[in-house]
Regions:
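Conserved, mostly hydrophobic/aromatic
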Residues: 15, 103, 112, 131, ...
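Active-site gating/metal-coordination segments in enzymes
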Residues: 77-191, 323
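Catalytic pocket-lining loop regions of alpha/beta-barrel enzymes
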Residues: 27-28, 138-139, 151-268, 296-300, ...
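Histidine-centered divalent metal-coordination motifs
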Residues: 15-21, 179, 213
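Short active-site segment of divalent metal-dependent hydrolases/proteases
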Residues: 18-19, 182, 216, 274
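Alpha-helical scaffolding within the catalytic cores
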Residues: 60-67, 95-100, 124-128, 194-197, ...
């Protein structure tokens, strides 16, 4: 728990990674460029004292992650999002098996999310079933702009994507996290377009679509979709660090999200190791919409922040919350 000014917050970090971006694992220049693009986000949007060297960033030890999330940081539970990118990384960037191994060594700390790619066809459906059997998945992380051979992306509205979403429904994998945010080199911007979420959310009302990075830079598109689709949620990873570098921009983002979605469908995420939960949580709890913007956006109350920082994600993943905080 994080406590400040008599208020306590249960923290569920909805977006973390334990990756291997080391040169030895980079398959080609695209893998190298992908890591360096992540690193640019890290250095440009982090407070100086939290910046790492590129070498530290490419591959960090398990012990450092545990310290940053749970000892120095305030995470009570963290969601490990699997990102394969096997066209660019020899052993994948961070796979379900790699994430599952670290979760097994730290019981109660992590939720492991799987991954699928509709371009894998029938074989991929079988693999998803095996992943579910092994890790009891409640969620997956999807990268619609991931490259595969000559293909540079896919859509949630594709016929094969529907097959996989139907399989998720059948297996009880109800939390569908989708990267719909800033482009990452060398991926294509349009392959991250949020528009296909509208189609899938309508077709699969029993699934929850967590739009990671809230569609940035297409925030308005995301908000107009989410306001009419009650099973669409906003993952705040990537939006959160603007607390430090662009606080008024962050106020605008939060104001729009709360106006259109309310506080019940927004999920905190650090996107570790790009950013660290310690300073994000501290700054978010201290943050308030500037006075001159409150006439349009209102204020963020401690109750709203509690939902965003952990209670909403706890509800999606059936996590036990300390009794005094269980108001969801």
């Amino acid at each position: 728990l994080y406590s400040k000014d008599g208020q306590s917050y249960f923290i569920v970090d909805g977006h973390t990674h334990f990756w291997d971006g080391s040169p030895a694992n980079q398959l080609n220049r695209y893998g190298e460029g992908f890591v360096k693009c992540f690193y640019d986000y890290h250095t440009n949007l982090s407070p100086y004292e939290y910046r790492w060297t590129l070498e530290e960033f490419e591959r960090f030890p398990e012990e450092r992650m545990i310290y940053d999330l749970f000892e120095s940081g305030y995470d009570d539970v963290a969601v490990l999002q699997s990102t394969y990118l096997t066209d660019w990384f020899v052993n994948g960037f961070n796979t379900t098996a790699q994430n599952g191994d670290i979760a097994a060594r730290h019981p109660g700390r992590f939720i492991v999310n799987g991954r699928w790619d509709p371009r894998d066809g029938e074989a991929g459906l079988d693999k998803l079933e095996r992943l579910q059997e092994r890790w009891q998945l409640k969620g997956v992380m999807l990268y619609t702009a991931e490259w595969k051979g000559d293909s540079k992306g896919w859509k949630l509205s594709d016929p094969w994507a529907y097959r996989y979403l139907e399989k998720c429904r059948e297996l009880g994998i109800v939390n569908i996290h989708v990267h719909k945010g800033p482009t990452v080199y060398p991926m294509n911007r349009d392959a991250f377009d949020v528009a296909d979420v509208d189609d899938a959310a309508t077709a699969f009302p029993g699934l929850r679509f967590i739009v990671e990075h809230v569609g940035l830079p297409r925030l308005e598109d995301f908000c107009w979709i989410a306001t009419q689709e009650p099973n669409v949620y906003g993952g705040l990873a990537m939006a959160m660090p603007f607390l430090h570098s662009r606080p008024r921009y962050f106020a605008q983002i939060m104001g729009e999200l709360v106006y259109w979605l309310g506080a019940d469908r927004l999920l905190f995420g650090s996107d570790y190791a790009i950013w660290q939960p310690k300073w994000l949580v501290e700054k978010f709890v201290d943050f308030q919409i500037p006075v001159d913007m409150q006439g349009e956006y209102g204020v963020l109350t401690p109750a709203m922040k509690r939902k965003i920082l952990g209670l909403n994600a706890a509800r999606l993943y059936d996590l036990k919350v300390p009794g005094e905080l269980d108001v969801a």
